[in-house]
């Protein structure tokens, strides 16, 4: 059973902007409306399941569904109805090999559909992402540690080469722990069994195909939408038990860019680039 749980660690690594150790997660994120931008809300549901082949080898299966809502109070000089509701659907298929008590190797393939789906599913909606990871963990010693090294390719990032995934975790005191790396850093205070407080710095973002290209000023066409943010935040987590919890996060975007892109992924229109408050809340069944 312990090996089965360990395989779940980072089985949802979908791209260089996403890490998750969750079996189930239900999450809501919002960036409220400002004078220079519309409000954005995102709902996510994911589920993952490892299938045991033998004591050392597992198949990983999973799926994620996300809905992105833009408020319908248009502030732009073009018809932006195509952007009101966007959807992302991921399927995960992976393989995990437990080399020994400390080392585990994982490979993950993630087909993705990301679009407004105005005209059903089109080939431009499809992307194929993959990740490979090496995980070294020593969670039984007095000061537990975990190191994750890997590469992840995501067509939506616009880079033609895999991007690095680096994460190091250490619980250096019964009440204190930290995690440093890309794409997330955290510093946690564990108050008794049920309450955890944290400060976090994280990356977030996505790319979605826009069917029915949007006609823009200067005769440009918007064929896709990308959002990337760097967020500094404080959070609270209520732990029902070791693996089940409710959580919330509140902060501010330190960097934020929303862009319309043409068929070659070149930026053709800036939707917003100023900072905004950032709220996230959810429920998860995880490993740690």
What do these predicted ranges mean?
Residues 24-26, 61-63, 107-109, 147-149, ...:
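Membrane-embedded beta-strand positions of outer-membrane beta-barrel proteins
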Residues 49-53, 97, 134-138, 170, ...:
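Residue-level signature of outer-membrane beta-barrel architecture
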Residues 55-60, 102-105, 139-147, 175-178, ...:
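Repeated loop/turn-to-beta-strand initiation elements of outer-membrane beta-barrel proteins
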Residues 63-89, 183-266, 272, 277-279:
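Outer-membrane beta-barrel translocator/channel fold
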């Amino acid at each position: 059973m312990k090996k089965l749980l360990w395989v779940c660690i980072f089985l949802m690594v979908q791209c260089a902007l996403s890490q998750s150790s969750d079996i189930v997660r239900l999450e809501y994120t919002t960036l409220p409306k400002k004078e220079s931008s519309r409000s954005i809300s995102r709902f996510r549901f994911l589920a993952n399941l490892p299938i045991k082949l033998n004591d050392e080898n597992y198949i990983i299966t999973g799926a994620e569904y996300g809905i992105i809502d833009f408020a319908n109070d248009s502030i732009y000089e073009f018809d932006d109805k195509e952007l009101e509701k966007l959807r992302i659907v991921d399927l995960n298929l992976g393989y995990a090999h437990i080399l020994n008590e400390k080392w585990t190797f994982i490979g993950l393939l993630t087909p993705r559909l990301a679009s407004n789906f105005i005209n059903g599913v089109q080939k431009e909606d499809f992307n194929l992402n993959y990740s490979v990871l090496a995980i070294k963990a020593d969670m039984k010693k007095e000061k537990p540690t975990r190191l994750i090294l890997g590469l992840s390719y995501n067509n939506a990032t616009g880079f033609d080469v895999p991007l690095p995934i680096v994460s190091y975790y250490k619980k250096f005191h019964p009440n204190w722990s930290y995690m440093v790396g890309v794409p997330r850093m955290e510093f946690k205070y564990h108050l008794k069994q049920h309450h955890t407080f944290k400060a976090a710095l994280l990356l977030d973002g996505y790319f979605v195909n826009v069917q029915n290209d949007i006609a823009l000023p200067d005769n440009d066409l918007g064929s896709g939408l990308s959002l990337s943010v760097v967020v500094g935040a404080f959070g609270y987590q209520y732990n029902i038990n070791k693996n089940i919890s409710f959580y919330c996060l509140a902060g501010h975007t330190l960097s934020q860019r929303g862009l319309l892109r043409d068929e070659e992924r070149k930026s053709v229109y800036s939707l917003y680039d100023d900072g905004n408050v950032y709220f996230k809340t959810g429920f998860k069944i995880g490993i740690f």
